Amino acid sequence: MPQMAPISWLLLFIIFSITFILFCSINYYSYMPNSPKSNELKNINLNSMNWKW
């Protein structure tokens, strides 16, 4: 079984690293939360925290 040269390992590592960084950044920037819905949920959670001592 032939062995790979160190430059090939470095190139392979660079390609996988760039692919991983691109994949993570695309996933991060593709998520767009719905602002009005999150504000309504926040208000509901704040109003439901009435402690009866």
UniProtKB/Swiss-Prot annotation:
Gene Ontology CC annotation, any one: mitochondrial membrane
Annotated effect of mutating I26M: In strain: HW00, HW09, NC37, NC48, TT00 and TT01
Topology in the lipid bilayer: Single-pass membrane protein
InterPro entries (alphabetical): ATP8_metazoa (IPR001421)
Keywords attached to this entry: ATP synthesis, CF(0), Hydrogen ion transport, Ion transport, Membrane, Mitochondrion, Transmembrane, Transmembrane helix, Transport
Record flagged with keyword Mitochondrion: yes
MF GO annotations: proton transmembrane transporter activity
Known partners and oligomeric status: F-type ATPases have 2 components, CF(1) - the catalytic core - and CF(0) - the membrane proton channel.
Family the entry assigns: Belongs to the ATPase protein 8 family.
Protein name: ATP synthase protein 8
Organism: Drosophila simulans (Fruit fly)
Gene behind the chain: mt:ATPase8
